Amino acid sequence: ALALTPAFKMKFWNIGGEGQVLIGGLAAAACMICLGDKLPNAVVILCMIVASLAAGAIWGFIPAFFKAKWNTNETLSTLMMNYIATQLVAFYTIVWEVPKGSGKIGIINQNTNVGWLPQIFGSKYLLSIVVAVVITIFMYVYLNYSKQGYEISVVGESENTAKYVGIKVEKVIIRTMLLSGALCGLVGLLLVGGINHTVTTTIAGGQGFTAVLVSWMSKFNPCLLYTSPSPR
């Protein structure tokens, strides 16, 4: 929900969070599988972080570019990107399946734990909580006290007003969706590298769609996300 909030505040209806999470997780899994026996663990994790952020950002950039240039319907384009991401994960599940013919990847680097994110106090969930808190603080400051956050608010209220005061709407749309997609990609990293240590087409578990409702119920306020009742 944190990842979708800046886009929603801009009135860009990013329904593609699920796909952006999947593609970020796929990028993390690719690093674990392809680099796990070639590079030190710390370097692999660094590559996973960069790859997941970049993959999510690219997945967010594509519908943003079409929206900015040709005013396409972002609800449809982001939704369709979910299906593409799902099929990509399904394809690479077959490519990387272990054992062959099983139709699944299984636990990645189970013997070496290369690419597994560190646990805090023996829990694989605490790291995700810490990251969520840090991003919440960042997002609150970004949306309420930065020039970029102000531009997001103005574009969300009225694109015509934004253009009148000299805000480059196309730039704001693309920049905001790069951020939104990157944060979704980070979620994929945490799911693959920190919790599940594998990737499947269902690894996001519908969180991308649940996040839409949670973000709405919190009125796009990062600090209120934790008080919003989950619809699940």
Go through the PLM ranges and name each one:
Residues Q20, G24, A28, A51-S52, ...:
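Alpha-helical transmembrane segments in multi-pass membrane proteins
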Residues A1-L2, L39, I58, P63-A64, ...:
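Alpha-helical transmembrane segments in inner-membrane proteins
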Residues A1-C34, L53, A57-T72, S215-N221:
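Single transmembrane alpha-helix segments in multi-pass membrane proteins
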Residues F121-T198, P222:
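Helix-loop-helix "hairpin" substructures at the membrane interface of multi-pass membrane proteins
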Residues E74-Y145, T198:
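Transmembrane helix-bundle core of multi-pass membrane transporters
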Residues A1, A42-V43, C47:
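Membrane-interfacial amphipathic/re-entrant helices at transmembrane-helix boundaries
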Residues Y226-P231:
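Conserved small/polar residues in nucleotide/adenosyl-binding loops
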Residues L4, F8, A28, M32, ...:
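Structural signal for membrane-spanning alpha-helices in multi-pass inner-membrane proteins
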